[in-house]
Amino acid sequence: MMSQADVLSGFDGFDIPDSPLGRPAVLPAVLAQMLIERLEEEKTIIVNQRLLDVDELHLQSLIMTAVQMGVWLLLTQGDQPAHGKACGLLSSEAALLSALSEGVHAGLIVSFRKPQEEQRKRLSLPASFFLGINLRDIAHVAQDERLIPYVLVRTERNAQLLGSLEQPSWDVKDAKDLLGQLEGLGFRSVLLSSPGDPASLADLLRWARNPYKGFQANTMGW
C-alpha cells in the first residue's frame, strides 16, 4: 500500500479496508499511521473495522486509537473470517453510537441494491458519513450529502479479480461517465478503487481534476 500511496498522492484521502474477504491482513490502523508519516499533505484517512471479529473492549480501544490519530472510522460487519469463528457481538448501530459519543468521525455502509425506502431508513442514522456500495443504477440511489459512492474501476489487469466479487465494477470509460452523473446529482465525494491497478486511478484522477471537465468532487483512493 505504501507504494500505491506515492502513485495516488493526488487524492484527497484514502480508505483502508480491514481483512478484505475475511483474509488476514495488516491492521488498518498500522497502515494509517504509515500513511500519515509518509504523506506530505494532510489527507482524510478512513480506517475500516470489521465488527464480526471483535468485542466491546476491542472497539473501545479502536475508538481511542482513532481519536489519537485523527482518522475516520468506517464500521462494517465484514465477510465471514477465513480463519477461526466470527464473534458477532456488536451491531453496526451500537458501534456507531459508541464512536460518535467520543467525537470520532464515524460512518456506516449503505447498499444501493436495497429499495430506496430501506436506504432512507439507513440514512436516518446519525452517522458522520455513509459509504454507498453496490452501485449499479443511479436511478436507485437515495440522496444524502453524507453519502460517498464506492466505484470499482475495472481494467485488463484486474478484470479477473473483480469478476469474482459480488460488487459491480466499471471500465475506465464508463467510470468517467458515472463520475459526471454523480456530480450532476450533487455528490461531493466518491471513493474510487482499482485493486491491482493503482495506475488506472491516477489516470482517472488526472481526468477528473482537468478544469475543462468541471468535476469538483473530492476523491479518495484505495
Spans of features found by a protein language model:
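Active-site pocket-lining/capping segments in soluble small-molecule metabolic enzymes
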Residues: 1, 6-8, 74-81, 86-113, ...
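Conserved N-terminal beta1-alpha1 strand-loop-helix module at the mouth
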Residues: 1-29
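Non-catalytic positions within long, well-ordered alpha-helices that form the structural scaffold/packing
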Residues: 6-7, 64-67, 121-125, 183
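A structural motif
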Residues: 11, 68-71, 125-128, 187
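Conserved beta-strand positions in the central sheet of alpha/beta enzyme cores
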Residues: 15, 72-75, 128-132, 191
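Acidic-and-aromatic substrate-binding clefts and catalytic sites of carbohydrate-active enzymes
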Residues: 19-27, 51-57, 134-140, 198-199
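Flavin-dependent oxidoreductase catalytic cores
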Residues: 21-39, 43, 169-170, 207
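Glycine-rich anion/phosphate-binding loops
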Residues: 52-68
